[in-house]
Amino acid sequence: MDFLPDIEKFKNFFDGTDSKNEISIAVEEAKKYDIFNLISRVSALNLFHQNQTKSVILDTYIEGVLCQTRDQFPSKYTISSGKFRKIINQISDTSLKYSIDPPENMFVQNVMFYGNYRVLNGIDQTPAYNLQHMISVLFAKGIEYPKEFLDATYILVNGMLEISEKIVGGILNTENNHDTDEEKGIMIPSAMELNKYTELVITNGADFRKLFLNRIELLDLVTIEFGVQFEGDFDNKSFYTRPFLYNEEKDQYILLNAGLLPTAIVFWITCLAKKYGIFEEVLENYNDYIFHECQKYLCNLGHKKVLESQMGIDLFSSSGYKEYIASVQNNQLVIVQYLYDDGKNYNACTLHSTIEKKEFNDVVSKRLSYHYSKIIEYGVEKEDIFVIIIINSLGRGMAYGIKKYDYCYPPLRIHPFELMCISINEKAESVFIPRYLKAKNNLQTFIQVTSQYPFQAI
C-alpha cells in the first residue's frame, strides 16, 4: 500500500501557494512597521499555552515575512496594539485555521543535562523524550565519540537549554488567566502582558554569543536571515532548522518559536554527527538504547523476555528492525517488533520528513507468520498470542503497510514514549496491554456486527 501520495494530497490542501496568498496582505502590512519588533511579538504568542496548536498559523506568517528581503522593511515605527491585533485576527481567519487540532501534548516538559531544564513541546509529540535519550546516549553511556564532536554538542545543548529555561521560567512566573477555547482564533493578550512575553524570546547578542563561546559554526547553524524561499509545508518551514533571527542594529537574537528548541537541538546534533562522520553510529546507538528501554517498559508491565530458542525460534534483526518474544501470563506470549529509522536517505536540510519503508511491508508480515507458526507448534493457542509493534524515529514519519493477517487481535502500534507512559501509569494493572487489545478487538467486532455501515478504522 502506497501511503505517501495520499499524505501529500492532504497536505497540499492547506500548503503551498494558497497559504502564501492568504497571508500576503498581512505581510505587506508588516512593511509599515519595525519588522523585528513585530516578528518578536508574533513569536511571543507561542508562549501562551492557549496558542499551543496555533503555531501552524503563526509560523506560516513568520515564514511569509522571512521570504521577503531585509530592505523591504525599512520602517522604524513600532506597531500599535490595535494594528497588531488586526494583523493577527486577519491571519487567524484564513484556511489555515482548519488545520488546527486540539492539543494532545504537554506544554512544558523537563530535560536533564548536568542540571534540570524545562522545554516547550510545541506541537511535536515526543521532542523532550527524544532529546533526553539522545543526551543519555552521548554523555551518560560511556560510548566513545570524537572529542571535537562532544565539545561542540555540549556547548550547543547547554546554550539552548539555558535559553529555554529562561523562557519557561518567565512564562511560569507570569500570571495567565486567559480561557482556553480551541474554537476561537489566536489568543491575543493585553499589550502589557504581550510585552513581558516578547522580552523572553529576545536574547542580547553578547550574551547569546557567550553561551556558544563565540563559535561561528554554531551561530551559523542556528541563525536565519531574510530572503528565504517560502515553504508552505507545515512540517518544514525554513526557520525550523534555524529558529533564531539576528537584529544587527540592536545586536539581539530573536527566537522565532520556542517550541522548536527540543526538536531542533536533536536535529543539530545529527548535523554535527554528519560533519564528524559518525551519523550512522550515533543513530544506531540511539535506536539500540531506545530498544533496551522499551524492554524495560514492557518488563515493568509484566512482560519479560523469554528464551525463544526453547521454542525453536531464531530471532532476526536488520538495519531498522529488531524483535523478541516476551511473556504475558500462564501460557500467553507477546511478539515484540521494533521498527526504527536507520537514517538512510536522511535529508539534513529539513527538520521533519516522511519516509516510506517498503522493506518493512514484507519483513513484518513474514516475521509475524514465522513467529505464529513456531509458537503454535510449541503448543500455545492462537488466541494467546499478542503483537506489539514499536515504531521509533527522530522527526521522520515512517509510512509502511502490513499485509492482512489472520490475527486474533490486531497489533498494538506504539511509540516508545507512549509505551513509557503506559508502563508508569498502568504498572499496577495486571497485563494491561493484552486486556486492552482484547477489549479493543471486542469493540471492533461489536461495531461491525451491529452497524449498518462498514466499520472504518481511523
Which residues fall in each region the model found?
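Interfaces and regulatory segments of ATP-dependent nucleotide/adenylate/phosphodiester-chemistry enzymes
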Residues: K86-L301, A399-I458
